[in-house]
Amino acid sequence: MYVFCICDLSKRFSLSFQPNFLCELGLQKQGFFHVAGVDEVGRGPLAGPVVTAAVILDKDRIPDGLNDSKKLSFLQRNRLYHEILQSALAASIASLCARTIDQSNIRKATLEAMRRCIIGLAVPAHYVLVDGRDIPSELPCPAMALIKGDQRSVSIAAASIIAKVTRDRMMECAGQVYTNYGLEKHVGYATLAHRRALDKYGPIVGLHRYSFAPLKERYRNDVS
């Protein structure tokens, strides 16, 4: 039986410094040699998929500058994206679309995408560190949820970068198809420009999340 736990490191430690590899090293000393960090991007937007990534870093080839993707510039994220994919022992990405999110809910969709990217790793994980409070079910190995994990673990930080860059690129592609919404700029979040485009053109079936406010009440009858 695997042990799953939640660890709120933010209550014990200051989060003002860079994430590190200490948690992974501790697990490796216990025999969990392949430790995967897992994170998601896209829980809150009105449009687009939720994207998750799992990364197993090589302890001897950890890219410099790994941090929570939200704290990095566009150029930093894209540089690290390539460095992570080149140096990691394994990396995996999974996403679930707006329709699936509407059919279940964002929490369930996120956890399912996390589960898929974990089992999709080319090198099987011996242990998984998941950012946040929730752990996917039916995993092939033990797991720990780390609150603010992307600020503590470089493996989770690496996963956050892979997920962020991947999702941003997906939304940029969507913006080339649906040119009136500015998707390449706000990547689906509820900015003023996005809400104005929704008022003018309406939501895009298959891309917008009809289960999210403010779309839920206004357009719920539009979904077949």
Curated annotation (Swiss-Prot):
Primary localization: cytoplasm
InterPro entries according to UniProt: RNase_HII, RNase_HII/HIII, RNase_HII/HIII_dom, RNaseH-like_sf, RNaseH_sf
Compartments it resides in: Cytoplasm
PROSITE patterns cross-referenced by the UniProt entry: RNASE_H_2
Family: Belongs to the RNase HII family.
Function field: Endonuclease that specifically degrades the RNA of RNA-DNA hybrids.
NCBIfam families with a match to the protein in the record: PRK00015.1-3
Listed name of the protein: Ribonuclease HII
Higher taxonomy: Bacteria, Pseudomonadati, Pseudomonadota, Alphaproteobacteria, Hyphomicrobiales
